[in-house]
C-alpha cells in the first residue's frame, strides 16, 4: 500500500500544510481511499495523480471541521467530474443530515448514488482488495482510527491444490488465475478458491485525534504502519497546561516503541510548528522528541508527499 498526505496541519491550515486528509492507495495503484476530508482537500488533489473517479470510499474519523469541512465540496466536484459509480462515505451519524442538507441547500445534484454509513455501526467494510475496521480512540468528541488490511495480496494460483484435484494445465488455469468461474468435469469452480496470497497482507492504521495512544495496543501490535497525530511537544503542553484531547510526539513514540510498531508516521501538527528553519518552534522539535523514545522507522508526514510500503516492510518516501 501507499500513503499520500493531502493535509497534515491541526485545526487550521498553514502556508505549508493543509488540514487533515490522507489517501490510502491500493498496492495495485488502481484505486484509493480517503481518510478525513478537511477544507481544501479537493484542491490538494489537483496536485496529485489521484483521480476522484478511482476513489473507492471516504472514511471520516470524527466531527471536527478540520477533518470534514471539505466533504460537500469534494462530493460536488466528483459529480461535476462525471463520476457515476456509487460512493460510500463512512462517517459519524450526526454528520449525515449536515452532508445531505448542504447538498440540497446549495442545489447540488450528484449523478452517482451517495451512500452515507454510520461509523458507529461499522464492523468491517470490504472491497475486493481491502478490509477496513475501526478502533475507538479518546478525544473531546468520539473519534476512531481506521485499520486497513489487505485481502489476498498479489494472488497467485495454488498450483499444489490444482494438481491435487487433477485440474489440467492450460486454458482452465488461465481463467482461474483471473478469479473467474469455470466448469470442469461437470462442476463449477470458483477461481478465487484457487488463489493464494504471494506475500503477507499489509496492515495500516490511520488514526483520528487521540489523547490515549494505549487504546491502540490490540491493533498496533504487528501492524506495518501506524499513522498518528502528534499535535504538540511536551514543552508546549507543560507551558499551556493541557493537551486539549491530543497527543504529544513523546507519548506516541513511547507507545509505538513498546508496541513494536515498525513504521510510525506522525501528522496533525499544530500550526505553531514552522518549516522555515529561521523560525521557532521548528517542526524538527517534533521529530527530535519522537526520536528520543522510538527506534523504528520514523516519518513526519509532509503535504503532497507519497510514501510506499515495500516488501521489506519499510515505509519510504516515493520520488
UniProtKB/Swiss-Prot annotation:
Keywords: Endonuclease, Hydrolase, Metal-binding, Nuclease, tRNA processing, Zinc. HAMAP family: RNase_Z_BN. SUPFAM superfamilies: Metallo-hydrolase/oxidoreductase. Gene3D superfamilies: Ribonuclease Z/Hydroxyacylglutathione hydrolase-like (3.60.15.10). It comes from the Bacteria. This is Ribonuclease Z. Belongs to the RNase Z family. Its cofactor is Zn(2+). Zinc phosphodiesterase, which displays some tRNA 3'-processing endonuclease activity. Probably involved in tRNA maturation, by removing a 3'-trailer from precursor tRNA. InterPro entries: Metallo-B-lactamas, RibonucZ/Hydroxyglut_hydro, RNase_Z/BN. It comes from Pseudomonas putida (strain ATCC 700007 / DSM 6899 / JCM 31910 / BCRC 17059 / LMG 24140 / F1). GO terms for molecular function: 3'-tRNA processing endoribonuclease activity; zinc ion binding. The active site is at 66 (proton acceptor). Binds 2 Zn(2+) ions. Homodimer. CDD domains: RNaseZ_ZiPD-like_MBL-fold (cd07717). It catalyses: Endonucleolytic cleavage of RNA, removing extra 3' nucleotides from tRNA precursor, generating 3' termini of tRNAs. A 3'-hydroxy group is left at the tRNA terminus and a 5'-phosphoryl group is left at the trailer molecule.
Amino acid at each position: 500500500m501507499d500513503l499520500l498526505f493531502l493535509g497534515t496541519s491541526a485545526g487550521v491550515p498553514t502556508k505549508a500544510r493543509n488540514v487533515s486528509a490522507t489517501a490510502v492507495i491500493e498496492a495495485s495503484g488502481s484505486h484509493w481511499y480517503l481518510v478525513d476530508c478537511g477544507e481544501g482537500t479537493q484542491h490538494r488533489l489537483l496536485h496529485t495523480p489521484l483521480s476522484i473517479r478511482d476513489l473507492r470510499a471516504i472514511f471520516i474519523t470524527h466531527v471536527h471541521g478540520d477533518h470534514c469541512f471539505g466533504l460537500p465540496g469534494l462530493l460536488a466536484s466528483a459529480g461535476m467530474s462525471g463520476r457515476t459509480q456509487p460512493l460510500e462515505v463512512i462517517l459519524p451519524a450526526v454528520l449525515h443530515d449536515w452532508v445531505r442538507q448542504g447538498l440540497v441547500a446549495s442545489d447540488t445534484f450528484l449523478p452517482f448514488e451517495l451512500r452515507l454509513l454510520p461509523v458507529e455501526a461499522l464492523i468491517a467494510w470490504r472491497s475486493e482488495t481491502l478490509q477496513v475496521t475501526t478502533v475507538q480512540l479518546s478525544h473531546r468528541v468520539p473519534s476512531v482510527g481506521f485499520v486497513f488490511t489487505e485481502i489476498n495480496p498479489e494472488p497467485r494460483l495454488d498450483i499444489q491444490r490444482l494438481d491435487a484435484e487433477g485440474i489440467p494445465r492450460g486454458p482452465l488455469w488461465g481463467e482461474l488465475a483471473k478469479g473467474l468461474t469455470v466448469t470442469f468435469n461437470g462442476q463449477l469452480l470458483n477461481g478465487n478458491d484457487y488463489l493464494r496470497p504471494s506475500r503477507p497482507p499489509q496492515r495500516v492504521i490511520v488514526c483520528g485525534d487521540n489523547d490515549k495512544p494505549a487504546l491502540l495496543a490490540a491493533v498496533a501490535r504487528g501492524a506495518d504502519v501506524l499513522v498518528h497525530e502528534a499535535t504538540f511537544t511536551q514543552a508546549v503542553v507543560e507551558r499551556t497546561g493541557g493537551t486539549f484531547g491530543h497527543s504529544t510526539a513523546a507519548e506516541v513514540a513511547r507507545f509505538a516503541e513498546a508496541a513494536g510498531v515498525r513504521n510510525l508516521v506522525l501528522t496533525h501538527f499544530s500550526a505553531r510548528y514552522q518549516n522555515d528553519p529561521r523560525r521557532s518552534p521548528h517542526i524538527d522539535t517534533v521529530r527530535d522528541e519522537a526520536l528520543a523514545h522510538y527506534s523504528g522507522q520514523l516519518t513526519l508526514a509532509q503535504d503532497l508527499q507519497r510514501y510506499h510500503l515495500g516488501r521489506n516492510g519499510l515505509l519510504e518516501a516515493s520520488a
